[in-house]
Amino acid sequence: KARGGVKVHVIIDWIGSRNINSALLDQMREAGVEVERYNPLVWYALTRLNHRDHRKMLIVDGRVGFIGGAGLADFWQGNADAPQHWRDAMFKLEGPAVAQMQAAFLDNWTKTNARVLDGDDYFPELRPAGDIPAQVFRSSPREGTEDIRLMYLLCIAAARKSIRLSASYYVPDDLTTQEFIEAAERGVKVEIILPGAKTDSGIVKHASRGKWGPLLKAGVKIYEYQPTMYHHKMMVVD
């Protein structure tokens, strides 16, 4: 696409891409792709070592967005039917919410490249693509996570029928746990799917299980996905 004249911009996290074959990046750059690594390690900024880019987004022409948990690696090549192929989900968005995704990408882009990407090529006029309202929330080490956390808590507190949560790394704080318990106690059906035996973080799995007791006692149903690593991050309320 870059050779054909399409403007292609790629951000990869410095730590997350530390094992990538540099020849692949060179090949992309030679074709005209602009590739930037997010927050490389430098001695004078060690306190920002944990400022990482964990977003997985693809925005096309500023009009179509894909967002979810899947990255660009062999784990996502198959159909989640083998241990080396992870189970995940991606979602396609159209309409004004895509501009919010684009803004999230460009926020990180300016931090790596210091060059603003603007104009109709990146922010075209977007009309509603349907009748379902959509809102994109974002978090970052600098901005914090309170917006996303607050929306999760409000949705859980507002639930009347059901809460279905998929989480690859589930170690909730006490307030979130209490909200789930109160939802179950008022009759909301709460179901949680987590990774099973096949996980990429045994430490997180053990920490997660330490949080299960009060949830199970309140009637929350917890399931472990068995076929392969479960990498979903998703919650559906009512």
Question: Could you describe each region identified by the protein language model?
Answer:
Residues 1-238:
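Charged, low-complexity intrinsically disordered terminal segments
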